[in-house]
């Protein structure tokens, strides 16, 4: 651009040095009108993700929308809360306005300044290029037993990020290969129906759910629901090994590993599958089959609400006002993966409960990355790891903006929580597969 500006500057100087003829002045004015906007054009749209952002959650939706339009997005790790930046287009600016998010239109010089700041070796920042919108699937039942207050379903709808709901039928048919990212609904992969049988008010729901699940199992050639769920869990694990991205919350995390470990035994009471649990089940657990957890004790008591001692949420005595966990600060330039997954405008996140609230740190496998923990209680709330060519993330608790979850509760209205730090962690995982693979150094 400079090679065009220098001759023009020389021309302007001589045009005015002698007062300038009217024709020459008119020509200069016309040139300024036509070409000056090119020299001062808007280069980028910056979506800040610090405390200035009006709606953090919908900001992820805009970034996803830009990707679906075939455009790239730069994720600026640790810059103003993990901001997004993309090349300026009027339609992108319009979309930001429509969705009500905070954005800034910046020129070339400011874009270069930001990238120079991020590239400084002395600062804990980096940028990751997001290239293609991942195809999203949520593993959840399609009948009335779907958890309408599932946090992932709620936030995907609020952020206007498209997704498909798939369940056992689709997975057993091999449909997982169609997707880049899978969320596990708050499922019980052990075949014990989340141990709801004897909970007050759940008897009829338990009986109906059991009937539906057993019919599905028989249709696919399984004698027991637990055997069908085990096969589904193994297929999901294979999906991850092949390069898929797996995200699970609450009981979808611990029951997944429990089912895999118990693949060669029976941990289900007769009330759940028609025969008694194997008395030697504990000794037959195979922890080499799991993703995250090892050396845990299963709870085969049908009257207990616990699956195992992985979850420490049942025994903790912490008031809601004191229940917080802290995100780790990773090196953005070297620990790129956990840095992406922990981008947030708050580093201390308020806790929330669920069937699986918090993970016992002593039960984690070596190599598991703890991204969020309550150190004083020896519990991990947010963990990550690799399996084969894929990656997985487990997040304890049910609803980041609903401390106590009960069946039948009204789903959280995220328009009342547009800046939720806890929900941001979910959306970090949704965008994660869009990142250029060669940048993932961890």
Where are the language model's segments positioned?
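Bacterial N-terminal signal peptides that target proteins for export
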Residues: 2-8, 12-28
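Bacterial N-terminal signal peptides
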Residues: 26-37
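Hydrophobic targeting/anchoring helices
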Residues: 42-148, 397, 404
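Extracellular ligand-binding/catalytic regions of CAZymes and related secreted enzymes
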Residues: 43-48, 54-85, 233, 266, ...
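Helical hinge/lid and interdomain linker segments adjacent to catalytic or ligand-binding clefts
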Residues: 44-45, 50-54, 85, 89-94, ...
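Alpha-helical scaffolding within the catalytic cores
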Residues: 119-124, 169-171, 377-381
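Catalytic beta-strand/loop cores that center a nucleophilic Ser/Cys/Thr
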Residues: 147-150, 155-157, 254, 265, ...
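Catalytic cores of eukaryotic secretory-pathway lumenal/extracellular enzymes that build
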Residues: 261, 270-272, 281-282
């Amino acid at each position: 651009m400079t090679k065009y500006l220098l001759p023009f500057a020389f021309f302007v100087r001589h045009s005015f040095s002698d007062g300038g003829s009217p024709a020459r002045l008119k020509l200069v004015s016309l040139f300024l009108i036509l070409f000056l906007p090119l020299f001062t054009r808007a280069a980028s749209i910056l979506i800040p993700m610090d405390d200035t952002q009006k709606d953090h959650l919908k900001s992820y939706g805009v970034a996803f929308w830009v990707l679906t339009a075939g455009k790239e997005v730069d994720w600026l790790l640790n810059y103003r809360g993990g901001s997004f930046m993309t090349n300026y287009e009027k339609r992108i600016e319009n979309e930001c306005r429509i969705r009500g998010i905070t954005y800034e239109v910046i020129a070339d010089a400011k874009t270069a300044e930001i990238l120079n700041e991020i590239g400084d070796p002395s600062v804990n920042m980096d940028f990751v290029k997001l290239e293609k919108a991942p195809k999203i699937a949520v593993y959840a039942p399609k009948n009335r037993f779907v958890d309408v207050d599932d946090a992932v379903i709620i936030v995907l709808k609020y952020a206007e990020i498209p997704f498909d709901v798939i369940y056992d039928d689709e997975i057993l048919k091999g449909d997982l290969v169609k997707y880049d990212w899978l969320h596990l609904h708050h499922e019980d992969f052990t075949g014990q129906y989340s141990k709801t049988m004897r909970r007050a008010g759940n008897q009829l729901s338990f009986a109906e759910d059991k009937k539906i699940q057993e019919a599905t199992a028989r249709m696919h050639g399984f004698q027991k629901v637990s055997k069908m769920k085990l096969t589904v869990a193994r297929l999901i694990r294979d999906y991850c090994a092949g390069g898929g991205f797996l995200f699970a919350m609450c009981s979808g995390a611990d029951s997944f590993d429990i089912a895999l470990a118990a693949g060669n035994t029976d941990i289900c009471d007769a009330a759940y599958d028609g025969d008694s649990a194997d008395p030697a089940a504990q000794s037959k657990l195979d922890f080499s089959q799991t993703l995250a957890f090892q050396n845990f004790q299963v709870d085969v008591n049908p009257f207990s609400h616990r699956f195992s001692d992985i979850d420490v949420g049942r025994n903790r005595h912490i008031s809601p006002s004191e229940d917080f966990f802290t995100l780790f600060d990773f090196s953005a330039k070297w620990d790129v993966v956990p840095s992406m997954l922990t981008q947030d405008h708050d580093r201390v996140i308020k806790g929330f409960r669920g069937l699986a609230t918090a993970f016992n740190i002593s039960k984690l496998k070596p190599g598991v990355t703890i991204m969020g923990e309550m150190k004083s209680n020896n519990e991990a709330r947010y963990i990550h790891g690799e399996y084969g060519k894929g990656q997985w993330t487990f997040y304890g608790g049910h609803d980041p903006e609903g401390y106590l979850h009960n069946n039948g509760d009204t789903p959280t209205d995220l328009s009342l929580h547009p800046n939720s730090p806890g929900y941001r962690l979910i959306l970090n995982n949704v965008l994660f597969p869009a990142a250029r693979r060669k940048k993932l150094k961890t």
